[in-house]
């Protein structure tokens, strides 16, 4: 019998739930959809100029950049209101893990 850790929990990415999943560490994987042969494959993270972890994902057949911290917060904490932002508690923009994120007011 295998016991899953909390890091092994994968939730759908709200923008494209049939194609991508995200875990608590900020990893994204393919969950089917466009290319079933890639199902389960963890996507390669990239970093933007400010140090945020980003992913290139396909939404409605168009490639889009998405921030890992926002995908994690949206999946595990719920939708992010327009007047709120996702804060990295430790100040490390390269750490998109759920334990490091909180939704706060702008400003």
What are these regions (language model features)?
Residues 1-86, 90-107:
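Conserved recognition-core residues within compact binding domains
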């Amino acid at each position: 019998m295998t016991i899953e850790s909390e890091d092994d929990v994968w939730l759908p990415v709200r923008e494209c739930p049939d194609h991508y999943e995200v875990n608590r560490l900020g990893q994204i994987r393919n969950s089917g959809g466009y290319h079933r042969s890639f199902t389960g494959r963890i996507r390669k993270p990239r970093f933007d100029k400010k140090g945020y972890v980003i992913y290139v994902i396909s939404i409605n057949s168009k490639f889009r950049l998405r921030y890992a911290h926002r995908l994690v917060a949206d999946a595990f904490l719920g939708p992010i209101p327009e007047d709120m932002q996702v804060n990295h508690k430790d100040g490390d923009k390269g750490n998109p893990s759920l334990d490091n994120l909180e939704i706060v007011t702008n400003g």
